[in-house]
Amino acid sequence: MALTFPSPEWTAQLKTVVNNDQAYAQSAKTWEGDFYFIIEPGPGIKQPVKMYLDLWHGKCRKAHIAAGVEDKPPEFTISGTLETYRRVFEKKLDPIQALMTRKLKVQGNMMKIVRSVKPTLDLVNCCSMIPTSYPDQVQA
């Protein structure tokens, strides 16, 4: 059954997939950083949705839809439209290219992400493993 992106269920499933993915565990074994992934308002999204991920040494320590502000701001904030995230998850848009062309906007040390291409691609691969539907495909 497909899970709707973005949703608490999809986010919880991503944590499970990341924590069971050997490729991500290996490529991100030295990665330390947390993120807000913000899905901007648009078709199917009435207000911004903030998904929080805490990635640490190849594992996901926390993953949830953030209702407010975290105790401390995350190291990175990446924001984009639902369609951009969909294209990245469906591997129709390279995530690094999306960052460089500002289809996905980054706050934080972009060079740290650019130097971490393999973990970035493996994280996107984890996202791609989740059977996903989108709010513009179903009534939200």
Protein language model features and the residues they cover:
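Feature captures hydrophobic
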Residues: M1-A140
